[in-house]
Amino acid sequence: MIYWIFLGLAIATEIIGTLSMKYASISGGMTGHIVMYVMITASYVMLSMAVKRVALGVAYALWEGIGILFITLFSVLWFDEPISALKVLGLVTLIVGIMLVKSGTRKPRKQVTPRGDNHATA
């Protein structure tokens, strides 16, 4: 469970870091750059913690996919970036792809060793 929390934190810090990058580019101040560097670094640290137990393909798909969704949403709301029907279609396709990647990942089964069969044969 803690590894999924790490993944959630990685996603949140990636979103904050990327939005800070945009803010820094339009404001010209150093605050946005500092927040960006700290958040992007934290994002990678949290992602590296998450992939200890979450499958890499799933973690990366969620990290990037959910990040793109929220970054696009906040860019439209806060920075007045345009959004077209084609972008919306792309985001919907992204959501479907993330769901397929997540549902296609299975936990490996534990191998059960029969009792009394632990000796080597020649």
Curated annotation (Swiss-Prot):
Family: Belongs to the drug/metabolite transporter (DMT) superfamily. Small multidrug resistance (SMR) (TC 2.A.7.1) family. MdtJ subfamily.
Higher taxonomy: Bacteria, Pseudomonadati, Pseudomonadota, Gammaproteobacteria, Enterobacterales
Name of this protein: Spermidine export protein MdtJ
TM ranges: 1-21, 31-51, 54-74, 81-101
GO CC terms: plasma membrane
Membrane topology: Multi-pass membrane protein
PANTHER family: SMR FAMILY PROTON-DEPENDENT DRUG EFFLUX TRANSPORTER SUGE, SPERMIDINE EXPORT PROTEIN MDTJ
Gene name tied to this protein: mdtJ
Keyword Cell membrane: yes
GO biological process, one term: glycine betaine transport
Self-association state and partner proteins as the record states: Forms a complex with MdtI.
Keywords carried by this UniProt record: Cell inner membrane, Cell membrane, Membrane, Transmembrane, Transmembrane helix, Transport
